[in-house]
Curated annotation (Swiss-Prot):
A zinc finger (C2H2-type) spans 323-347, 498-522. It comes from Danio rerio (Zebrafish). May act as a co-chaperone for HSP70. This is DnaJ homolog subfamily C member 21. Keywords: Chaperone, Coiled coil, Metal-binding, Repeat, Zinc, Zinc-finger. Residues 339-348, 394-406, 535-545 have a biased composition (Basic residues). SMART domains: DnaJ, ZnF_C2H2, ZnF_U1. Residues 122-141, 276-302, 331-497, 522-545 are annotated as: Disordered.
């Protein structure tokens, strides 16, 4: 089979117009009607021209032909392909060459021919003219220069990549596919086969290059030369280092200390200067004695160092306190900075704000204290009003009963005054008094004959003290107390009740008495009977409200 491009006489990258022009020209030349003297040969050539144009004029047919051109030219895709490329396996032995000369059977001549044949095959499978014009480095001869020939050759061929497409290795003919899905599957399998064959060919060529390079005398000579150069460089570096050490050692031996750097000379000069200053100020004769005295003083004052340090620390604390601004919450390092800060506008604003806050706090505290005192006074007034109301009601009943049950009791002795303990609760614990609300069986003693002569203030005091013992359940307590005292009415004890049991100090108001008990701790515990009586009085006062 002949190549279609060669039949039409065009290049492989020819355009459709070029193909059409070439086809018309050849068709007119080889048409059978115009070649009657050689009709059979003309007809055969005309068939080839027409078949080539039919394939190349169709884009799909042309693409498939370009991919399978080599296979078609060498037997077709049906498996009858005969690969006429060079067999590289036979060149992996040392028996393929004799010696390392440039003769026909020498090392360099044999492998030069091998790589030239590989280059020829690669150019045949190139699609573009640019690929054909690419230069493949030559293997060279036994005397070729390493840098210009040998190094370039091995640099290219050690990374060799073939241009062959290995279309003859395909297993399926995509033209025989019944549908596009089957065609795609065939193309996928054919691509895998081509890639595998291409990879194997590249690896084979690279292995051959490694085999040749290992035995190339030019490479060995260059390697030896490089080793010698490296050894010579290392030797020179070592020699240079040794010379530097010797020169440094020599400089160290020849070094002399300068007079201005000698410490001994400096010490002498210092001593001389001290002696001169001592003579000038009259301290030279006593310098040694002064030193001894100073040492003794230092030893003697060891114990006083701690005290001095403590005093210094206290002074430093005072100093730093003076450098602290509480209004701005800032500390300063010097008196000047503190003074500048105290003159600043921001500092004055902060001081005014702080002063205002302190005044507001003082006002709020004083107001709270005043309100608390007013509340206490109001509570006292309320208690007094309640007691007055209750006493008025009960005194009115007593007066009624006195008119009916008044009997002469002038001969009865007065009941002795008793001091009751002060309770801890807000209610006062008073001595029990006879209740005017008792039944008629209980005799009510008459007042003392001198009662009519008493002033009004005394009478009111007796009425208030009697009214405090009244309540809803106060009658029972009054009965018990009257029986215990033989039915004699107790004397008024209001003034006695505002007295501290512990220190016997009298107070004008209950608030003062309670403040005294809280501050001194003179409060005493009540008995169970007194506590129950006090709670009952509280309940009675609440209900009467």
């Amino acid at each position: 089979m002949k190549c279609h491009y060669e039949v039409l006489g065009v290049k492989r990258d020819a355009s459709d117009d070029d193909l059409k022009k070439a086809y018309r020209k050849l068709a007119l030349k080889w048409h059978p009607d115009k070649n009657l003297d050689n009709a059979e040969d003309a007809a055969e050539q005309f068939k080839l021209i027409q078949a080539a144009y039919d394939v190349l004029s169709d884009p799909q047919e042309r693409a498939w032909y370009d991919n399978h051109r080599e296979a078609l030219l060498k037997g077709g895709v049906s498996g009858e392909y005969q690969d006429d490329s060079i067999d590289l396996v036979q060149f992996f032995t040392v028996t393929c060459y004799s010696g390392y000369g440039d003769d026909e059977k020498g090392f360099y001549a044999v492998y030069r021919n091998v790589f030239e044949s590989i280059v020829k095959e690669e150019k045949e499978h190139s699609k573009d003219e640019e690929d054909e014009e690419d230069e493949f480095p030559s293997f060279g001869e036994s005397e070729s220069d390493y840098d210009t020939v040998v190094h370039l050759f091995y640099g290219y061929w050690q990374s060799f990549c073939t241009r062959k497409n290995f279309a003859w290795k395909e297993e399926y003919d995509t033209r025989q596919a019944s549908n596009r899905w089957e065609k795609r599957a065939m193309e996928k399998e054919n691509k895998k086969t081509r890639d595998k064959a291409r990879k194997e060919h590249n690896e084979l060529v690279r292995q051959l290059v490694a085999f040749v390079r290992k035995r190339d005398k030019r490479v060995q000579a260059h390697k030896k030369l490089v080793e010698e150069q490296n050894a010579e460089k290392a030797k020179k570096v070592e020699e240079l280092r040794r010379k530097q050490k010797l020169s440094q050692a020599k400089l160290a031996e020849d070094y002399q200390e300068q007079s201005w750097t000698a410490m001994s000379e400096l010490e002498k000069e210092l001593q001389q200067m001290e002696a001169e200053y001592g003579q000038e100020f009259g301290d030279a004769s006593d310098s040694e004695e002064n030193e001894e005295e100073l040492e003794s003083r230092d030893i003697a004052n060891v114990d006083g160092v701690d005290a001095v340090m403590a005093d210094g620390a206290a002074e430093m604390d005072d100093y730093y306190d003076d450098l602290y601004c509480p209004a701005c919450d800032k500390s300063f390092k010097s008196d000047k900075a503190m003074k500048n800060h105290s003159k600043s506008k921001k500092h004055r604003e902060m001081v005014a704000l702080l002063r205002q806050q302190l005044e507001e706090e003082d006002e709020s505290l004083s107001q709270n204290c005043a309100e608390r005192e007013e509340d206490d006074e109001e509570e006292d007034d309320d208690d007094d009003d309640e007691q007055n109301d209750t006493s008025k009601q009960k005194l009115s009943k007593r007066q009624k009963k006195k008119k009916r049950l008044q009997k002469p009791v002038n001969n009865l002795p007065e009941a002795p005054e008793t001091v009751s303990p002060v309770p801890q609760s807000t209610e006062e614990h008073l001595s029990p008094a006879p209740d005017s609300g008792n039944t008629e069986d209980t005799p009510v003693p008459s007042e003392d004959p001198d009662d009519g002569v008493k002033p009004d203030g005394q009478e009111n005091t007796n009425q208030k003290s009697t009214a405090k013992t009244k309540g809803k359940k106060g009658g029972k307590d009054s009965k018990k107390s009257s029986k215990a005292h033989g039915g004699v009415e107790a004397a008024p004890e209001k003034e006695v009740n505002l007295r501290c049991v512990t220190c016997q100090y009298e107070f004008t108001t209950r608030n003062k008495l309670f403040d005294h008990l809280k501050s001194t701790g003179h409060a005493t515990a009540l008995s169970s009977s007194n506590t129950s009586q006090t709670s009952k009085k509280k309940k009675d006062s609440r209900k009467n409200r």
